[in-house]
Amino acid sequence: MILINLEHILAHISFFLPFLATLVFWGRIVCIDNKRIGSLGNKSIIIAYICITGLLLTRWFHSRHLLLSNLYESFMFLSWSFCLIHIVSEIGSKNDWLGIIIVLIAMLTHGFATVGLPIEMQQSTVLVPALQSHWLIMHVSMMIPSYATLPCGSLLVIALLITTLNKNKNFPILKFNVNSFIWSLILEKKFYLGGSGGDISSRNSSSGNGSDNDSNNNNNKKTFHSLSIDCRKLQLTQQLDYWSYRIISLGSLFLTIGILSGAVWVNEAWGSYWSWDPKETWALITWLLSAIHIHIRMIRGWQGEKPAIIASSGSSIVWFRYLGVNSPEKGLHSYGWLN
């Protein structure tokens, strides 16, 4: 009873903290640019990750088996994976846009598991003999991280496509690389307009007459303001492209190991390596899409929009494979949730 109460407490805390972090990241992007507020969001996710880890360990100790036997447990493991992805990406990028996307998915996943699923599906059950296999641990512990990484990568490339939607019309600077010196001036806010000393506006005001100086000063402000926006947008698109490719590559690795270990497990349980189960078929489709994306990045050297268009379809396919195929009471992977 104590373990069950502890599990419920950890479940509610680990849902509230990603919700708080989502509000913090959105607030920092929209209206409040404060590093202390941003650190509050990151600390909330770290604490949520610890709470979910404690929840999983508590439930594991209570049920005496790996927590991957039903939809509720897989959702909790999925939320745990999303939090871990955010922590790793935050260490590497320091970009709140990644936090907005990843933390929001973690919150929705955790909320659906605790609120959307019936109480009966949240109870721990005894594993059937076919599931009592070490290959099950290998298979599911690889597939769940692939469910976390592949949708994250796909959502990042969707954000990339939205960011560069009208770049040829409104953001011509995105067509070429920007000198690193300009990057350091603009992105670190060392390029001031309208200040004192040796800045542009003061040199203009000391070398010309009134109206001409005002006109030139306004033109300079508009030009460099546009340049600053375009450079920041270029930096954002480069980070989205960088992280989406690496996250999708990591997800493809998890998916490959999961498919191979699943084939061995199915052969042990039912005597066949591949049975064209609905989820097996959609797993193969997902693997082919991710393989095409990695191939055109590594072999053809494509970057930006072209591989992003291919990868953008991965998010909907992965979620359909996870929920749409799992929900009906058909197939070896079914949880029968809709029934």
From Swiss-Prot:
InterPro entries: Cyt_c_assembly, Cyt_c_biogenesis_CcsA, Cyt_c_biogenesis_CcsA/CcmC. It comes from the Eukaryota. It is a multi-pass membrane protein. One of its GO terms (molecular function) is heme binding. Keywords: Chloroplast, Cytochrome c-type biogenesis, Membrane, Plastid, Thylakoid, Transmembrane, Transmembrane helix. The chain crosses the membrane at residues 6-26, 37-57, 71-91, 97-117, 142-162, 247-267, 281-299. Pfam families: Cytochrom_C_asm (PF01578). It is found in: Plastid, Chloroplast thylakoid membrane. The keyword Plastid applies. One of its GO terms (cellular component) is plasma membrane. Its main location: plastid. GO terms for biological process: cytochrome complex assembly. May interact with Ccs1. Required during biogenesis of c-type cytochromes (cytochrome c6 and cytochrome f) at the step of heme attachment. Belongs to the CcmF/CycK/Ccl1/NrfE/CcsA family. This is Cytochrome c biogenesis protein CcsA. It comes from Anthoceros angustus.
